[in-house]
């Protein structure tokens, strides 16, 4: 729980150095008496964190008001950290900012602890949001160029500013995520990743936030963030086992969303080098791909496009409802036809797969999407005079009566006059006329 806080020691030390020098430039702090100084020296030299904590508590009891109150709070937070007591760290940091609202390091600790303690109660989330906003408000003043210590480089100072901003945006994103404010969460997580691209946990949170928007256009962005969380290695990465699990999950979800592995390697390659998706980044969904293909099909083959649309609806999650409400007992494509793009389709077209019975059939099975697929059964009231050969193309219209999903098939009741391409009945051979009998001579 405290791993992320252990990584901030150097950053906090740099901030405190700047703060300490700023105090020195303003007003030199003074000890109340020699006893206070001696107590501080004991605290400074004590290596045992439990003993140090007891000395700090003595200092607090004996000298509640001191010029070194900020330093004392800081030492108490660090000592509780050594003891692994996160709640006490948070309580101390809260008391610190209550005593000094401009104690930027106190606000910083509250940000870190809000997320790591994982208290999602409304009060804790409110506290985290307040701490993050307070931190952002104070950064410009606390880390202005004028306050940079001489021994600190411009690069170090700017990095410290970016680190503080990253922590604040990370907290705001986490709070928004827990409040189910998913668009806000994504916005804050992106700002955090711009300042610290190595935080795989933030990438995973950003993926979760985008998924939970339930907006189609954000699902591809979610996949990018999950790819980043799985692909990132080095500082800030997940452990290897967790990365493997994330990668398996990413691959499965990518295929489910996109319909195939096409483009997946390119997404992973991009995610290895970038923490946030570039402007205009998009992964097309299966539905978007199919819709695009259908639009093209409407122009090139409107009859097939009509059938593909019907079949997609019937095989979808609401197929039974679609059949009952839109197809059952309906004449398809109808006496006036169905508009498809700029064309009105008045008959569907298929290829004969089989006839039942083979001679004088009452049923013909057709493939519409492909000549070999048994997708439609045409049912005639009376046997046909002749059976069409397999491979024969027919155009038809009729009344839909039933359908099955496994195997997929739609049944149409048709009249011979509504079917084009049926073979003409074979004409009977003309009767052979017998030659007239010869007249017998008398």
Regions found by a protein language model. Give the residues of each.
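Residue at a conserved register position within TPR or TPR-like alpha-solenoid repeats
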Residues: 46, 80, 114-116, 176, ...
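Short solvent-exposed coil/turn linkers within tandem alpha-helical repeat scaffolds
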Residues: 62-71, 98-104, 141-163, 192-199, ...
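Structural motif corresponding to the intra-repeat A-B loop/turn of tetratricopeptide repeats
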Residues: 46, 83, 117-122, 179, ...
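OB-fold and OB-like single-stranded nucleic-acid-recognition modules
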Residues: 264-442
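TPR/TPR-like (Sel1-like) alpha-helical repeat modules
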Residues: 115, 126-140, 211-237, 272
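N-terminal leader/linker segments that initiate helical-solenoid repeat arrays
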Residues: 22-75
């Amino acid at each position: 729980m405290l791993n992320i806080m252990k990584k901030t020691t150097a950053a906090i030390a740099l901030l405190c150095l700047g703060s300490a020098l700023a105090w020195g430039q303003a007003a030199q702090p003074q000890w109340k008496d020699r006893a206070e100084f001696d107590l501080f020296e004991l605290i400074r030299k004590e290596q045992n964190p439990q003993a140090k904590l007891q000395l700090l508590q003595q200092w607090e009891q004996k000298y509640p008001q001191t010029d070194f109150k900020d330093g004392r709070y800081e030492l108490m937070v660090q000592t509780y950290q050594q003891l692994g007591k996160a709640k006490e760290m948070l309580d101390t940091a809260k008391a610190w900012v209550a005593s000094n609202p401009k104690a930027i390091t106190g606000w910083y600790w509250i940000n870190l602890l809000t997320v790591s303690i994982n208290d999602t109660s409304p009060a804790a989330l409110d506290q985290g949001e307040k701490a993050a906003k307070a931190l952002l408000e104070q950064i410009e003043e606390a880390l202005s160029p004028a306050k940079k210590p001489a021994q600190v480089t411009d690069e170090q100072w700017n990095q410290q500013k970016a680190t503080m901003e990253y922590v604040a945006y990370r907290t705001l994103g986490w709070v928004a995520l827990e409040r189910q404010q998913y668009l806000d969460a994504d916005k804050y997580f992106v700002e955090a990743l711009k300042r610290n691209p190595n935080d795989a946990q933030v990438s995973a949170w950003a993926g979760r936030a985008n998924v939970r928007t339930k907006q189609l256009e954000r699902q591809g962005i979610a996949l990018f963030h999950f790819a980043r969380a799985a692909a990132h290695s080095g500082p800030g990465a997940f452990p290897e086992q967790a990365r493997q699990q994330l990668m398996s999950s990413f691959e499965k979800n990518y295929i489910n969303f996109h319909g195939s592995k096409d483009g997946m390697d390119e997404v992973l390659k991009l995610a290895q080098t970038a923490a946030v998706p570039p402007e205009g980044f998009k992964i097309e969904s299966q539905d978007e791909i199919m819709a695009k293909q259908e639009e093209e099909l409407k122009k090139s083959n409107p009859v097939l496009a009509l059938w593909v649309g019907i079949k997609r609806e019937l095989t979808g999650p609401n197929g039974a409802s679609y059949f009952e409400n839109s197809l059952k007992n309906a004449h398809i494509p109808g006496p006036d036809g169905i508009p498809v793009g700029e064309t009105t389709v008045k008959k569907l077209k298929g290829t004969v797969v089989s006839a039942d019975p083979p001679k004088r059939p009452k049923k013909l099975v057709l493939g519409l999407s492909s000549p070999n697929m048994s997708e439609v059964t045409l049912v005639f009231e009376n046997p046909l005079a002749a059976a069409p050969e397999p491979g024969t193309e027919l155009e038809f219209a009729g009344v839909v009566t039933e359908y099955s999903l496994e195997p997929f098939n739609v049944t149409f009741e048709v009249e011979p006059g509504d079917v084009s391409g049926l073979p003409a009945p074979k004409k009977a051979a003309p009767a052979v006329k017998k030659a007239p009998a010869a007249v017998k001579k008398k």
